[in-house]
């Protein structure tokens, strides 16, 4: 076992990541050291990188990133199985959570770990034990209390890497929003989350599934993931016309569920207008604190509409996500979610290429770092 790991350390917006050597910690009896095999650049990572989700960073920087998969490098002495009780050994491929519900607050005691207000900590520097706090490194330390699950052999790392963030997040979000057989679903944003949400909604027998974006390549990919209709913002620049189209495509009713997977709050009011009376708006994309929207409350009252906010998920969703990938691997082109791969040393290039904000188009759906 090496004494150090390589990690990309972030020092703030506008500053390059620096590759540093970081101590590998002693593994707690209930902890697991994981050799990262793929770490994706998530949309929330771009928010932090660009600075529109400001954080107070430690002086020694921050190892961030969370959407990842890997192999067991070392098991704590008390860990013999994964979280479902299946035998686990060093070298096994695993999918795992990246947040740690406290287990003591009201939400946790009410069996709602995804709602735990303490599950995500402020950024910790690489000098703070256990040092390996994020995905953008060649090792990750799963602390005691984290959940991990063995990965089916037929799923490659590039397909598994989104499981613990994008796929689990959208599966849990659609579950919380109450999507039912035959529901009409609007998906705003055809990035990594939106594409996977399209496939999940179709698997839940939603019909029609309508995907809204402004990048033609992503909308074409949305069709490959089952979208019944796609709506290009540039082709239909008027908001009222877009809402009218959604009404037409849903038999004059509107969407049962509309979802924000974009991350810019300007889309929210439009999404709510696309809902039917009694519909539900699922807000996942906008994580930036301080963002504001103009919303007429009577839209909710007279329309009996609901807004549901979701961040992270209950860990039981991960094994279901893995099973879902196995079951649908011949149906949907999962290998196309990761469109670009970079070595860890080229993380600055990967982030610059992944940035789509204020660009007319982009060829990247999701970039993966391969340490």
What is each model feature region?
Residues 206, 223, 228, 233, ...:
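Glycine-rich phosphate-binding loop and adjacent beta-alpha segment
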Residues 42, 84-88, 97-149, 153, ...:
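Cysteine-cluster motifs in flexible loop/terminal segments that predominantly coordinate metals
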Residues 138, 152-236, 244:
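Mid-domain Rossmann-like dinucleotide-binding core that forms the NAD(H)/NADP(H) cofactor-binding site
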Residues 240-251:
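Conserved amphipathic alpha-helix within the SDR
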Residues 25-39, 53-109, 152-154:
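Glycine-rich beta-strand-centered segment in the early N-terminal region that forms part
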């Amino acid at each position: 076992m090496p004494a150090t790991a390589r990690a990309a350390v972030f020092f703030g917006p506008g500053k390059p990541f620096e590759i540093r050597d970081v101590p590998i910690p002693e593994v707690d009896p209930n902890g697991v050291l994981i050799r990262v095999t793929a770490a994706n650049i998530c949309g929330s990572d771009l928010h932090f990188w660009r600075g529109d989700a400001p954080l107070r960073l430690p002086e020694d920087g921050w190892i961030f990133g969370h959407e990842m998969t890997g192999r067991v490098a070392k098991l704590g002495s008390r860990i013999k199985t994964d979280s479902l009780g299946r035998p686990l050994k060093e070298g096994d491929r695993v999918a795992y959570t990246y947040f740690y519900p406290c287990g003591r607050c009201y939400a946790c005691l009410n069996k709602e770990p995804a709602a735990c207000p303490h599950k995500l900590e402020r950024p910790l520097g690489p000098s703070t034990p256990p040092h390996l706090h994020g995905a953008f490194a060649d090792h990750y330390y799963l602390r005691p209390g984290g959940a991990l699950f063995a990965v089916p052999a037929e799923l490659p790392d590039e397909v598994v890497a989104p499981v613990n963030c994008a796929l689990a997040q959208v599966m849990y979000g659609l579950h919380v929003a109450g999507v039912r057989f035959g529901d009409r679903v609007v998906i705003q944003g055809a990035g990594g989350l939106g594409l996977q949400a399209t496939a999940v909604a179709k698997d839940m027998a939603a019909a029609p599934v309508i995907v809204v974006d402004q990048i033609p390549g992503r909308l074409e990919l949305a069709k490959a993931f089952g979208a019944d209709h796609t709506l290009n913002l540039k082709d239909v620049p008027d908001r009222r016309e877009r809402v009218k189209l959604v009404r037409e495509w849903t038999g004059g009713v509107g969407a049962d569920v509309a979802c924000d997977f974009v991350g810019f709050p300007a889309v929210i009011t439009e999404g709510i207008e696309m809902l039917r009376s009694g519909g539900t708006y699922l807000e996942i994309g906008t994580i930036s604190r301080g963002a504001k929207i103009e919303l007429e409350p009577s839209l909710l009252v007279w329309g009996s509409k609901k807004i549901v906010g979701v961040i992270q998920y209950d860990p039981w969703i991960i094994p279901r996500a893995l099973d879902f990938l196995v079951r649908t691997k011949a149906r949907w082109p999962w290998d196309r979610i990761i469109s670009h791969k970079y070595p860890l040393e080229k993380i600055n290039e990967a982030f610059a290429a992944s940035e789509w904000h204020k660009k007319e188009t982009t060829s990247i759906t999701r970039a993966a770092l391969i340490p």
